[in-house]
Amino acid sequence: MSGNNLSGNDEFDEQLRMQELYGGDPKEGDTQNEPSGEAHSLGQPPDDTPYEWDLDKKAWFPKITEDFIATYQANYGFSSDGASSSTANVQDANTKAVEEPPQKEVPETPDSKRKGEKRKAESGWFHVEEDRNTNVYVSGLPPDITVDEFIQLMSKFGIIMRDPQTEEFKVKLYKDDQGNLKGDGLCCYLKKESVELALKLLDEDEIRGYKLHVEVAKFQLKGEYDASKKKKKCKDYKKKLSLQQKQLDWRPERRAGPNRLRHERVVILKNMFHPMDFEDDPLVLNEIREDLRVECSKFGQIRKLLLFDRHPDGVASVSFREPEEADHCIQTLDGRWFGGRQITAQAWDGTTDYQVEETSREREERLRGWEAFLNAPEASRGLRRMDSIAGSERPGPSRMRHFSEHPSMSNMKAQEATTGMAFEETIDENKFEKAEEGGESEGDASEKDAKEGGSDGDHPEREGGEGCSKKENEEGCPERALEPEEGNPQTEAQENGPEREARKKSKMDYEKNGFSKESEDNDLGKESEGEDSLKKESEDDDSEEESEEDSSEKQSQDGSDKEIEENGVKKDVDQDVSDKEFPEDVEKESEENETDKSEFDEGSERVLDEEGSEREFEEDSDEKEEEGDDDEEEVVYERVFDDDSDDIEEEEEADEKECEDADDKEEDNDIDEKLFDDSDEKEDEEDTDGKKDDDASDKVFEDNSNEKLFDEEEGPNEKLFDDSDERGTVGNVKEDGSQSTDSSFALSSSDDDDDEV
């Protein structure tokens, strides 16, 4: 079987080779010569591969023979020991077959032998491609030209390449054997476009009378070339080439001189504030930022401004555009005072982070406060909002932050800034003292007839107090605003009806005499009364206090209410009048609770009616005085309500009339003094003192009325009457029209504060 198989294979192989050589179809042998004698094997066509039937898989598969394995291995370049027999058989078949034509052998190249190895460049002269040639040859140069001058000339047309090893420009000026310049040179550009630009612009140009000629450089071998002298390439050559490519970027050239670092543009300001300052009023942070921006903008353009509100050192940073601007800011602000603190200014070191993160406890407290605010009722929330607004608008040390102008006076500025609240309190006290002095000077003349018309002025004043109390939450009453500052809580004096009447009668006398200024009693509104003025005068003058005590004893014995004023002047008051005034006061208080703001305009008529009822119960001597007072009061009330619409000329005419009434009133005062002398002989000395005081006060009031009061009355009265119209109170109008020169200063400043609120 083995012999048959070998003979069959040899014949099959021979047929295949003959088919390849001659292109003919090999003859297929008989089916008997097939290697397998199985019944299921079928004869195949001569040009096809023989197949055999697989009984297990029930399919035809190519018949695997030695020839099939040999052809398979020959196609895939695989050789094994098992294929040696097939190769031997092939050689035997070649001897039998027709000789094939000889094939030309391809000589093996060194590339095929050295696959994967880098080809070494042959040592010899180099040739530069035209597309990559960026060298320019310039001839006709002046013999005295220098390398720097040549570089400056050639750099006008492009970027000159630098040597990657020496970092010098690739330019060369040729010299002869003796070292003298020949007048030609070479320049190597970075880009090909620079060569074309130099050929167009520099060719045929003249320098110092020498005509230049420019052309593309051509390199030729002259003599013998020694390859051993060629420079070796540096390992970092590629890195330096990449650095040269950066010269083509659109980057501005660096300025000459030392380059300053970026963090030198930032200024750090310390001790600007304290973190606790922002807990009560967080809006202070915006105020400090705005003040700092305004101050630092004087030194240059500000790029960024930050306040590190949680930093314990009170740090703020200001970033300028240029370092020079930051230097100017540091030089100016270092050591200056801001908000009562001496600040320090320095440049940022570039590493310190001044941002302080919020701790978990602080975050919980902040969220707890916010939750309490959200859960609070809307009414209390609105009150808090109004309180915060009012507190933010009130002048205080937190609102007085500013930079000191003179650093040399830093100590004085520090004391002033730290005692800002004390300055405000002293200002208020000075206002109070001025108003008090003004009230004492006016009291000598105005309070002589304090008893007369006391009940007449009671209603308007109390009505004005009610109007002020109603509007206290909305607009704020200026009289109440002055109470805590001046420290005059006088609730006991309000309960005394006769004393209140005496005070209001004195106000009526001020209007009659034409003294349209505010006294200390009017500054304090409804709370300043005759009893307090009695206490103040007792501290100034002991003799007046004794006279007041005697008069008070006399009132208790006789059963009549006699008012004792600041000058010690006493008035004749009947017991019947005083007995009737007390029930009238009770009736007035009940009427005040029922009246609204709309009834303030009718206060003058109601007061006149009450005066008429009082005159019925008075004696004949008092009736004359009351009648004169009624006429004068009518003129005063008409003037008070007409001043808002009258011009300045009408006010001056009214003032002249009041001056005449003041002269008449002085005569009445003399009559009252005489009556008082007849009724009581023990008080002659006090009467003489009262007359002296009256004469001195008359002179003072005459001078003030002729020179100062009428000139100053126009501006303040108009403002005060406007305020009275807005509030709708009669008492306030009367007080505004009867203030003194000293107290008008205090009230004018307080009115300004109220307007701001």
Swiss-Prot record:
Start-end of Basic and acidic residues biased regions: 97-123, 445-483, 497-538, 552-585, 595-609, 689-709, 716-737
Cross-referenced PROSITE patterns: RRM
Positions bearing Phosphoserine: 388, 404, 408, 410, 441, 446, 519, 528, 556, 560, 578, 598, 604, 613, 621, 645, 679, 705, 724, 749
UniProt family annotation: Belongs to the HTATSF1 family.
GO BP term (any one): protein localization to site of double-strand break
Positions of region (Disordered): 1-54, 80-123, 383-417, 432-757
Cellular component, GO annotation: nucleoplasm; site of double-strand break; U2-type spliceosomal complex
Keyword Glycoprotein: no
Cross-link (Glycyl lysine isopeptide (Lys-Gly) (interchain with G-Cter in SUMO2)): 431
Lineage: Eukaryota, Metazoa, Chordata, Craniata, Vertebrata
Sequence ranges of Polar residues compositional bias: 80-94, 407-417
GO molecular function: chromatin-protein adaptor activity; poly-ADP-D-ribose modification-dependent protein binding; RNA binding
Protein name: 17S U2 SnRNP complex component HTATSF1
Post-translational modification: Phosphorylation at Ser-749 by CK2 during S-phase in response to DNA damage promotes interaction with TOPBP1 and double-strand break (DSB) repair via homologous recombination.
Localization terms from the record: Nucleus; Chromosome
Compositionally biased spans, kind Low complexity: 738-749
Residue numbers spanned by region U2AF homology motif (UHM): 260-354
Residue span of region Mediates interaction with the P-TEFb complex: 382-757
